[in-house]
């Protein structure tokens, strides 16, 4: 089975630099406490690492 990441936006984007806002939007997160499921690959991991202070991440088998 392929691994996937369950990503939830837990902190607000107010006052954050524009590159962090763009990264969160690229992950598919628009609203606070919204959760999305993304493939576990190097590109997604890089984006998660960039905004790890704003999100929570869980690995799931899907």
From Swiss-Prot:
Keyword Ribosomal protein: yes
InterPro entries associated with the record: Ribo_uL30_ferredoxin-like_sf, Ribosomal_uL30_bac-type, Ribosomal_uL30_CS, Ribosomal_uL30_ferredoxin-like
Family matches, as Pfam families: Ribosomal_L30 (PF00327)
GO MF term set: structural constituent of ribosome
Cellular component per GO, a single term: cytosolic large ribosomal subunit
Gene Ontology biological process terms, A to Z: translation
Keywords, sorted A to Z: Ribonucleoprotein, Ribosomal protein
Source species, domain of life: Bacteria
Family per record: Belongs to the universal ribosomal protein uL30 family.
Subunit structure: Part of the 50S ribosomal subunit.
NCBIfam families: rpmD_bact (TIGR01308)
Protein name: Large ribosomal subunit protein uL30
Organism ancestry: Bacteria, Bacillati, Bacillota, Bacilli, Bacillales
